[in-house]
């Protein structure tokens, strides 16, 4: 078998996720990207509650009601000879653990920034996660059709707060009502903006050359002079694009535009397919696996319940790392040691499923899961190794959960353990009593859990406040010291959904004192799946 077609398929894959603060325009940009990839015909801007026109990528019932993207969905589309896999990440205040983990399955990220607001809190947190693997970052400065902050100032803020150099690729011509387009620094072209064309791909008028008198005629003498002055400053003060620095996560190419007006998104996509890496190598506990390895390997980074309300199923999302998936192939689930035939893997267009005949490195496929697959599971063609770097994050918010009907304790526990396996929430059972504590990274996760317990497990649960401030997974090599630690701290110990011992601290002060008191015990903020 000639290897050339396989190598070609690997080389043309680009797998990325979008990170942003809520309401920076992530869902809108997702829509426009799909429009350019011809995955959808018209972009249905995400409407508020009660509207029946919903964004293609927000499909779970609760998302439809709230107009937010709760679950990570996956969309694949062709663009300029490349095949792009876009992993949509929840952008709302919460759902962050899912979002964090999704970032472990991509080779590149697009950071969307609201240019009127600059760097916001959630963007900071997500960027921290991308730093764990030095993921390459592209930046899109959004909402230029509104009044924005000085673009130079916003770029400086990104550089100082997120510790990444910025290299502007395009530069805005005016903003708000005076927004006239963008100038491309490397092509020496100005693209002129027309408002009201956001739902389709517009024919853009291009003016070649910064000194072209046509430019003055198109945007006015004053704005043209301002643009030339700004660009002189920008070219003197900012970084030039350097692909190696980009691939090492040290420098981000910056694009300007308006996702709502569908302007500038294509420049970013062009940059993505031209500069972003094809599928990258991944570490396992035994060796590094490269995408062009002949044998199939992949890991599960997310489990999604009820993608199909008609069937009560769960789907495990698997990132293909190496080799080629073919329908009906036998794979080993390393954690259980079982060999399974995968005949019905799925590919996605957010909620629209289609069965996949083959998949290549960089692709995301869905495996039907009846409770046997967990986050972090590695699948191979027989090799016993495990991919590393798929973390669990210590929750920051806690509630005690209890039943309205005490007879349904068994269903409650089953529901919570399953929801924790798919990463919707973490569950802790204190060692010294029968409480059930739910831990999350954001408040909205609590609502999701109660709603899903009701609809999927027929359990009515309510929350109560609990005096827990943070949690850490604990371990210790010295058995004797660990026994003593457990004996003296029983009241603060719990088991998580995977039966891992956890220290539950009522306050940060308590945690710090306990850590000082037991230097041999390791307190972990993240735990490998």
Curated annotation (Swiss-Prot):
GO biological process, one term: regulation of translational termination
Subcellular location: Cytoplasm
Family matches, as SUPFAM superfamilies: EF-G C-terminal domain-like, P-loop containing nucleoside triphosphate hydrolases, Translation proteins
A Pfam family per the record: RF3_C
GO CC, alphabetical: cytosol
Membrane spanning stretches: none
Keywords, in A-Z order: Cytoplasm, GTP-binding, Nucleotide-binding, Protein biosynthesis
UniProt cross-references to NCBIfam families, sorted A to Z: prfC, PRK00741.1, small_GTP
Its job: Increases the formation of ribosomal termination complexes and stimulates activities of RF-1 and RF-2. It binds guanine nucleotides and has strong preference for UGA stop codons. It may interact directly with the ribosome. The stimulation of RF-1 and RF-2 is significantly reduced by GTP and GDP, but not by GMP.
Record-stated family: Belongs to the TRAFAC class translation factor GTPase superfamily. Classic translation factor GTPase family. PrfC subfamily.
The protein, known as: Peptide chain release factor 3
Annotated organism of origin: Erwinia tasmaniensis (strain DSM 17950 / CFBP 7177 / CIP 109463 / NCPPB 4357 / Et1/99)
